[in-house]
């Protein structure tokens, strides 16, 4: 069974824990209790493959930012979560993305942009803005509501698919690089 290390990042209060708990335990946590770092595991079937999701729910508060490099090193894929009612949390996404790329020392890292709290009546970030940013980054965009469970499975499962794609691409590149160059043949005269 394949294990996927998923990391949920974003500013404080965007609903990272609520999304994760909704996926793992099928219930909505409505009280805000700032997370330092929590880890969850769940076995799921995605596209016919049974897999184990190892999900790290991270601290959004700035005082825990020193811990970020460590979990970014070990994560295979990242949910970049913002709250649709918080323009600031949306602006912070670029900082998280750049830090992930720096720590992973890679231009392309599996990520999904997640606009959470879509059940709320007033949005400060419209979906066109979010779609445009996701397009610029070359990553999928999923709208979610941890409260109603809308898009929750889709967000995590899409991230697993992005990790699979990334592994397939790296595998293909590796095979191409390992092929010997057969155009030149040595002959002893």
Curated annotation (Swiss-Prot):
Q: What class of enzyme is it?
A: hydrolase
The catalytic activity of this protein is classed by the Enzyme Commission as 3.6.5.2
List lipidated residues, S-geranylgeranyl cysteine: 186
Q: Please list the residues that make up the propeptide.
A: 187-189
Q: Which domain of life is it from?
A: Eukaryota
**Mutation effect (residue 38 to E):** Mild rough eye phenotype
Q: Where is this motif: Effector region?
A: 32-40
One cellular component term from this protein's GO annotations in UniProt: membrane
Question: What UniProt keywords are attached to this protein's entry?
Answer: Cell membrane, GTP-binding, Hydrolase, Lipoprotein, Membrane, Methylation, Nucleotide-binding, Prenylation
The question of whether rRNA-binding is a record keyword is answered with no
Q: Where in the cell is it found?
A: Cell membrane
Query: What residues bind GTP, as annotated?
Result: 10-17, 57-61, 116-119
Might you name a Gene Ontology BP term for this protein?
A: photoreceptor cell fate determination
Where does the entry say this protein is expressed, by tissue? Expressed in the posterior termini of the embryo, restricted mainly to the embryonic central nervous system, and in the eye imaginal disk.
Q: What does this protein do?
A: Ras proteins bind GDP/GTP and possess intrinsic GTPase activity. Plays a role in eye development by regulating cell growth, survival of postmitotic ommatidial cells and differentiation of photoreceptor cells. During larval development, mediates Ptth/tor signaling leading to the production of ecdysone, a hormone required for the initiation of metamorphosis.
The UniProt family comment states:
Belongs to the small GTPase superfamily. Ras family.
What protein is this chain from?
Answer: Ras-like protein 1
Annotated organism of origin: Drosophila melanogaster (Fruit fly)
Name of the coding gene: Ras85D
């Amino acid at each position: 069974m394949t294990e996927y290390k998923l990391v949920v990042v974003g500013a404080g209060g965007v609903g990272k824990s609520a999304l994760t708990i909704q996926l793992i335990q099928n219930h909505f946590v409505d009280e805000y209790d700032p997370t330092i770092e929590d880890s969850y595991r769940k076995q799921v079937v995605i596209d016919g493959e049974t897999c184990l999701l190892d999900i790290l729910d991270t601290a959004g508060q700035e005082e825990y930012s020193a811990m970020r490099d460590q979990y970014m090193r070990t994560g295979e894929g990242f949910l970049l979560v913002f709250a649709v009612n918080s323009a600031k949390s949306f602006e912070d996404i670029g900082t998280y993305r750049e830090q992930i790329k720096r720590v992973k020392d890679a231009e392309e890292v599996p990520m999904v942009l997640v606009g959470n709290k879509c059940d709320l009546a007033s949005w400060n970030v419209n979906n066109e803005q979010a779609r445009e940013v996701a397009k610029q980054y070359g990553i999928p965009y999923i709208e979610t509501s941890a409260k109603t469970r809308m898009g929750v499975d889709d967000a995590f499962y899409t991230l697993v698919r992005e990790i699979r794609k990334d592994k397939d691409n790296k595998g293909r590149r590796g095979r191409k690089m390992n092929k010997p160059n057969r155009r030149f043949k040595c002959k002893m005269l």
